[in-house]
Amino acid sequence: LNELKKKVLALIEELSPDNENLTDDPDISAKMEDVITQVMFELARFKKIPDYVEMKVKKGDLIRFEDIADESDYQVYQVNLIRGVEYETKANGTVFKFLEDGTAEIEYFRYPTRITDKNRAKYEFELSDDALEIMPYGVAADLLKSDVSTNYGSIYAQRYEQLKQLLDPRFN
């Protein structure tokens, strides 16, 4: 996490290595982790993070993304495949009605783990290396978007969009 922050701050020329927050700018320091999370979630939709969970179900059960999240501790954004039991898809693929008892083997794509006070010190990114390489541009663009005195925000945004188009959609 600190390495990414250093890359972003060096890119926008705000790095102060002696400062505990790595920058002397309190606005940037306050926004940094929220912006990192936002860009990370955006990139996870391009570079999908696959996961798997098994859930015991009964005939007639309705399972929503929230139920999968409760079982797996991850925020789901797309179910890829369900095996092991018959089911119907409802609500545009966000609700599943099970037609028999059994174990649903659910393969899904999820968002990365959020940065929190509990995991900040040991946070490890779950995105692929190519996504992590372009992430500083997305974070820098967002941090500088309201800085009208320079054009760096839009320059970084353009570069980020270009690099995003080059991402291989397969994970790692």
Language-model segments: residues:
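Glycine-enriched, solvent-exposed interface loops adjoining structured elements
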Residues: 1-172
